[in-house]
Swiss-Prot record:
Source superkingdom: Eukaryota
Record's protein name: Unknown protein 24 from 2D-PAGE
Amino acid sequence: GPEVTFLKXM
């Protein structure tokens, strides 16, 4: 979900 995209952005 969106949480994965957030981790990738980090």
